[in-house]
């Protein structure tokens, strides 16, 4: 994921948690914060409760790939995505569908593109 698409600083994460709103499904919690920019920025969080480092890194890779696929349809806001335990059992296509579902629930899904 390109640097300009990432939330990196603690203050950026805290702003999204504090001022944004959250939407969830069984696999993911997504915090959204409206922002004036041309593309979205995202921060990923996978707790140590979800498994060892290999499993957590796999989950982050799946989430990043799903975001790459969903990019044209996601509104240009700031997001923090937190993975829940059931997400570790999902395949790539299931992760993509689950994130798409939670983005639609958050009303940030823009129908267009690919």
Curated annotation (Swiss-Prot):
It holds the Pfam family Ribonuclease_P. The keyword Hydrolase applies. InterPro entries: Ribosomal_Su5_D2-typ_SF (IPR020568), Ribsml_uS5_D2-typ_fold_subgr (IPR014721), RNase_P (IPR000100), RNase_P_CS (IPR020539). GO terms for molecular function: 3'-tRNA processing endoribonuclease activity; ribonuclease P activity; tRNA binding. PANTHER family: RIBONUCLEASE P PROTEIN COMPONENT (PTHR33992:SF1). Belongs to the RnpA family. It comes from the Bacteria. Keywords: Endonuclease, Hydrolase, Nuclease, RNA-binding, tRNA processing. Signal peptide: none annotated. Consists of a catalytic RNA component (M1 or rnpB) and a protein subunit. The keyword Transport does not apply. This is Ribonuclease P protein component. Its EC number is 3.1.26.5. One of its GO terms (biological process) is tRNA 5'-leader removal. It catalyses: Endonucleolytic cleavage of RNA, removing 5'-extranucleotides from tRNA precursor. It comes from Exiguobacterium sp. (strain ATCC BAA-1283 / AT1b). It is an enzyme of class 3 (hydrolase). RNaseP catalyzes the removal of the 5'-leader sequence from pre-tRNA to produce the mature 5'-terminus. It can also cleave other RNA substrates such as 4.5S RNA. The protein component plays an auxiliary but essential role in vivo by binding to the 5'-leader sequence and broadening the substrate specificity of the ribozyme. One of its GO terms (cellular component) is ribonuclease P complex.
């Amino acid at each position: 994921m390109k640097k300009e698409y990432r939330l990196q600083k603690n203050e950026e994460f805290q702003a999204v948690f504090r001022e944004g709103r959250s939407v969830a499904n069984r696999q993911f919690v997504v915090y959204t914060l409206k922002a004036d920019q041309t593309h979205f920025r995202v921060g990923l969080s996978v707790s140590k409760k979800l498994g060892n480092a290999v499993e957590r890194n796999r989950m982050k890779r799946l989430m990043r790939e799903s975001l790459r696929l969903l990019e044209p349809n996601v509104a240009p806001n700031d997001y923090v995505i937190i993975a829940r335990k059931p997400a570790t059992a999902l395949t790539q296509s299931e992760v993509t569908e689950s994130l798409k579902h939670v983005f639609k629930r958050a009303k940030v899904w823009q129908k267009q593109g690919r």
